[in-house]
Amino acid sequence: MKLWKQCLWILAQAACTFAVAQPPVSAHEAEYGQAAAAYQKQDFATVIRLLQPLAEQGDATAQHNLAVLYQDGLGVPASAEKALYWYEKAATQGQAEAQFMAGLMYSDGNGMPQNYEKAAFWYRKAAEQGHADAQNNLAARYATGTGVAKDLAEALKWYRAAAAQGHPTAGHTLQQLERLPEAQKQPAR
């Protein structure tokens, strides 16, 4: 359900951006408006019909939203493989939420093999753009050495970044790590 709301939010943002821009900034303005309206009505077949061509043309927002539909099985059979395909398409274009979701899919391995190195790769890409959940997850990777070399100094860096944005888990974990002796917090060599 959270992904469904997230997709609606991204579609609404795209529609609003197109609606207030003068002159129209994209040939896709009408499609985004129609897709957002169909999404609100839970007419997912129409959403897919409108987003699929945009995604195939390389539109990162459409690619991300199509991934959400495949992940949640909205208007299409649920497919982790197709969801990951579209997340990675959007992620390679720099879309932080798609980068985070690709990392999450590789981390969780739901419907696909786990790959902690790829999870860390995508978490880092999103974390570098300020995505708090990705910063927290990347920090956890460094704290445990999962998919990356264990490095508490790097973990602290990313926990601090996430906590600065109000991420509750990061703040709690940061407090615990800050209590460690300084020697344990030094960068790995």
Give the label of every model feature segment:
Residues 1-10:
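Bacterial N-terminal signal peptides that target proteins for export
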Residues 3, 24, 28, 149, ...:
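Terminal, low-structured helical/coil segments at or just beyond the last alpha-helical repeat
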Residues 13-50, 189:
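N-terminal leader/linker segments that initiate helical-solenoid repeat arrays
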Residues 26, 31, 39-43, 56-59, ...:
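Short helix-capping/linker turns of helical repeat alpha-solenoids
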Residues 31-38, 50-54, 65-72, 101-108, ...:
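Hydrophobic face of amphipathic alpha-helices that form TPR/SEL1-like repeat modules
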Residues 40-49, 77-89, 113-122, 149-158, ...:
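Structural signature of tandem alpha-helical TPR/SEL1-like repeats
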Residues 64-65, 97-101, 133-137, 152, ...:
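Alpha-solenoid helical repeat scaffolds
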